[in-house]
Every structure is written in structure tokens, then in C-alpha cells.
Design a protein with these regions (language model features):
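Bacterial N-terminal signal peptides
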Residues: 1-10
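Sec/Tat signal peptide C-region and signal peptidase I cleavage site
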Residues: 12-15
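Membrane-proximal cytoplasmic juxtamembrane segment of single-pass cell-surface glycoproteins
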Residues: 495-498
Length: 502
């Protein structure tokens, strides 16, 4: 019996080791080169045992995602278990601010938007707005003016079954300017290209929230619609014993992207029988799910007429022509349709976040189980190189000039994680600088189409500048005064010259 127990314990340990790959901690200076590009690890922010002091940052605690500001000046790292977002200078990589998510009912009441009817509390009744928030993903709106950061859950809601929340940061000051309710367990958030809508995807119960943000004034934003993907997942879990909400959460809605014309919203389904949910934004109605790609769809990106997917478990990047995908989506007869013709490229196991270089030629994929950053050439759909990342990478962003890639790594159990890796990329063929399209259109409303202008945008120009950008107004006034002085001086000299000639 003792021998059998020993054998069983040994087998259990072996299986555990096999399920969690060995931890990797590459040194700064690690590099990889191919004919198309070279990539080098140039900096880190880490907080694990044995960390080099020069790279240690105590605020890095299970970093979920990173977002580089569209102007390239700084980047934001969402520290999920730290209940904070850490802000770094893009040039020096020094920490410049920590945004903490600790709220109290009365103290922070003014930050909350007007509640909607979409998100009722069904389990908790007291001190609902006293909590700490666990930041997940984020997206910019209004040309980079605001950063939207959903919370995995409110800390008292141990099983993420009541409404969570989303914080909005003014990136000029890096202060919280608005809090809004969400559905349970929001993970992904996306802004439409025209800047009018923010979509919040609720992993926790198969729903997607739509927020109207067409105004420049955060006080005028409001919840517009709550959409259901097939069915609302019933939530009635324990209030004292925590369960695993990262699994068995219905369709586990994740990757979220608006089509370039903003007519449709696509949402990846990591769970259930998978696929991509399609929402018609003109009618704000759920159309059904497109199947046919590999299971376990994690992240979605649209670029140059293609829809790209990361396939988590199998470790693939897939793509298909967006027109072909939308044709299938529009012909859904019932709840699902199956689409064939996907192009595949195998990368590392556990493909999570993907982003594409400014030229559209390269896909960068954070591969969790492989502890690597993979690069795929979209012209051939083949891997061109890969490089080690601190275990286990999940989040990723690329700068608008393609020069820097930032990767965040969470742990698996008590292993790995607590790391942010910064890579510098040099391309054989120069990359263009990507145009800022983060909801920028809302800042340039069409003057010849009054129906598309919002009340808050139709204010007098000077009043609007004063309200939203006082520094710019002072510059305008100063320039005007200098011009006036110059004109007066010119006229006086001209008059004096005329008198002499006479």
C-alpha cells in the first residue's frame, strides 16, 4: 500500500509539472534576428523572487495588459491583483504614477454615472460602491484623451456574479474622472472608430454592454444597450466559498472588435462551442455566431481587409478575408453558421493577445504556455522569429511606429508572472507610423452634417477650448496679441514713412 501511495504521489507530481511548463526569465539584452526583423529585450518591470533591483517594481502584481498611449509618450500597465494601473514614461521607462482603485460609497459618489436598469444587484445589498477594483484590459477613446479600464470584479464579490464597474482615466492628468457600472466579470473593452460607442464584453454571463460616448463631456455618457449572446448565464454561487470563474462561464466572451465601418461588432467566444458572435450596430441586435475556426478563440484584430484570431489552447494565429466573414455572418439562418477557408499559422502554445505592426506585415503573439513572443509574417502566414518572455505572457501592445512591443506576464498558480517585458524591434524594411484612430473622429465632428453633431460639441469654439483645453486657449490668445502688435507697429512705420516722403 505504501508503495502504491508513493507511486501515485510521484505520478501526480509529474502530471502537475507537465501541465505547468518550466518558468523562463530571460535577461535584458536577449535578442532574436531574422531576415525581416530583429527584436531585443531592452527593459523590464518585475516583482518576483530574485529580481534584479534595477528592474524591480513593487506595484507589478499579476499584470494583465498594457496600453501605449497613441502619442507615444507613456504606457499603462494594469496590475490586476495590485488593484492599480501603473503609468510609465515611454522614453525612460520610469514609473510616473500609480492609479489606485480603492473606492468608498460617499467619498467617491460624484464619480459615478447615472445608474441604468441593465445591471441590478441580486446578491449584495450594502456598501455596494465600497470596494477595490481589479483592472483587466483597457482601450482609449476620444483620440487618446480617455482610457477605459474594466474591473474583473468588485473585491467583495468573490465569485463575480453581481455588477462590476469600469473606470475612465483622463490621460492628461492620469486621474479617474468617471465610474460606470458593468455586467459581471467584464474583461474586454473596445471603442468604435467614429468614437461614438464603447463596447464592454462580460465574460461572466454572455452579455455585451454598449455605452454611448458621442459627447466630449463624460457627464453626458450613458448606457445605451445590453445585448445577450444566445442566453444569460444564471449566476447563483456561494457568497463564502470561491469558485473558478475563469472557466465554465458560458461562452467566456473575450476578444472584441468593431468592423472598420462600425456597422458590426465581433466578439470571440473562448468557451462553449466557440465561434465569433456578431452584433449589428445599426439595429443593436445580436445576429448569431460564426463557427468554423479552431476552438478557444481568444483575441480578434482587423487589419487590411483581414480578420485575425489568436487560438489559445492549440497555439495558432488564424485569418480570413473580412468580406468573406461578413457575408457568412449576414446569411446566418438561425443561431450559427459554419465558415471554411481559414489560413493558419502555428505559433507557441497558449496564444493570447495579438497585435499587428503599422505596415500590417507582422503579427506579434504573446504565447502563454510557451513563454515566448512569436512574430508571424502576414505575407506568407509563417513564423519569422520568436523570443523568450518572462513566464507566462498574456497581454501585449505595440507602439504606433512599431518600434516597441510591451508584453505583460501573469503567473500560473504560484509560478511565474509579475513581469513586464519591453522589446525594441528593428525592421529590414522601414515601418510607417500608424495613424491615431482611437475614437479620434469624435473630436472632428462633420460641420456639414448637423445630425452628427452632439450638443456638447456645438458650443461656441472658444468656450469649448476653455472648458476642455485651457492651455491651448492661452496659446491662441497669446498668438493673437502678438499678431495684433505686429500689425500696429507695421502701420505706424508705414504712416511715418509717408509723412517723410510728403
Amino acid at each position: 500500500m505504501i508503495l502504491l501511495c508513493a507511486l501515485w504521489m510521484g505520478l501526480t507530481r509529474a502530471m502537475a509539472q507537465q501541465s505547468t511548463p518550466s518558468v523562463v526569465h530571460p535577461n535584458v539584452g536577449t535578442s532574436s534576428t531574422s531576415d525581416q526583423l530583429s527584436i531585443k529585450l531592452v527593459n523590464k518591470h518585475i516583482n518576483y523572487g530574485g529580481s534584479q533591483e534595477q528592474y524591480r517594481d513593487a506595484y507589478i502584481n499579476s499584470p494583465k495588459s498594457a496600453n501605449i498611449h497613441p502619442d507615444g509618450s507613456k504606457y499603462y500597465v494594469n496590475s490586476l491583483e495590485g488593484c492599480a494601473t501603473v503609468v510609465y514614461d515611454m522614453k525612460t521607462h520610469k514609473r510616473i504614477k500609480v492609479i489606485h482603485y480603492k473606492f468608498e460609497d460617499e467619498k467617491d459618489a460624484a464619480l459615478w454615472s447615472k445608474p441604468s436598469e441593465f445591471y441590478p444587484f441580486t446578491h449584495y445589498t450594502e456598501h455596494l460602491n465600497t470596494f477595490m477594483g481589479k483592472p483587466v484590459e483597457s482601450t482609449f477613446s476620444h483620440g487618446g484623451r480617455y482610457l477605459w479600464i474594466p474591473f474583473y470584479r468588485r473585491t467583495y464579490d468573490i465569485n463575480a456574479q453581481d455588477p462590476s464597474a469600469i473606470a475612465v482615466i483622463d490621460t492628461r492628468t492620469d486621474e479617474i474622472v468617471k465610474l460606470m457600472e458593468t455586467g459581471p466579470l467584464p474583461k474586454m473593452v473596445a471603442c468604435s472608430h467614429d468614437g461614438r460607442h464603447v463596447a464592454i464584453t462580460h465574460w461572466g454571463n454572455n452579455t455585451v454592454g454598449i455605452v454611448n460616448v458621442a459627447s466630449l463631456n463624460p457627464d453626458e455618457w450613458y448606457h445605451e444597450k445590453l445585448l445577450v449572446v444566445d442566453y444569460v448565464l444564471p449566476l447563483n454561487f456561494s457568497l463564502t466559498q470561491q469558485i473558478d470563474r475563469d472557466n465554465k462561464s458560458g461562452y467566456c466572451l473575450r476578444g472584441t472588435v468593431f468592423t472598420p465601418d462600425d456597422k458590426y461588432l465581433l466578439v470571440g467566444c473562448m468557451g462553449g462551442n466557440g465561434g465569433i458572435a456578431v452584433i449589428d450596430m445599426s439595429t443593436q441586435k445580436y445576429m448569431g455566431r460564426v463557427l468554423g475556426m479552431m476552438a478557444n478563440v481568444r483575441h480578434l484584430v482587423i487589419r487590411d481587409g483581414y480578420l485575425y484570431l489568436s487560438i489559445n489552447k492549440a497555439g495558432y494565429v488564424q485569418r480570413i478575408k473580412l468580406d468573406k466573414f461578413m457575408q457568412a455572418a449576414k446569411n446566418i439562418n438561425g443561431k450559427t453558421t459554419t465558415l471554411s477557408g481559414w489560413e493558419n499559422c502555428q505559433v507557441g502554445a497558449g496564444a493570447r493577445t495579438i497585435e499587428i505592426s503599422p505596415s500590417g506585415h507582422f503579427v506579434f503573439a504573446a504565447c502563454n504556455l510557451a513563454s515566448k513572443l512569436y512574430v508571424v509574417d502576414t505575407r506568407t502566414m509563417k513564423v519569422v522569429t520568436n523570443i523568450d518572455v518572462d513566464s507566462y505572457p498574456v497581454g501585449l501592445d505595440i507602439s504606433n511606429d512599431g518600434r516597441f512591443v510591451i508584453v505583460t506576464s501573469q503567473g500560473r498558480g504560484n509560478s511565474g508572472g509579475n513581469a513586464v517585458n519591453i522589446y525594441e524591434v528593428e525592421y529590414t524594411e522601414p515601418e510607417p507610423v500608424m495613424e491615431n484612430t482611437d475614437g479620434a473622429a469624435v473630436l472632428n465632428m462633420l460641420k456639414d452634417d448637423p445630425s452628427k453633431q452632439q450638443a456638447s460639441v456645438e458650443k461656441d469654439n472658444i468656450a469649448t477650448v476653455l472648458e476642455h483645453d485651457g492651455d491651448s486657449l492661452l496659446l491662441y490668445i497669446g498668438a493673437g496679441l502678438l499678431a495684433a502688435v505686429a500689425v500696429v507697429a507695421f502701420l505706424m512705420r508705414r504712416r511715418k514713412g509717408a509723412q517723410i516722403r510728403n
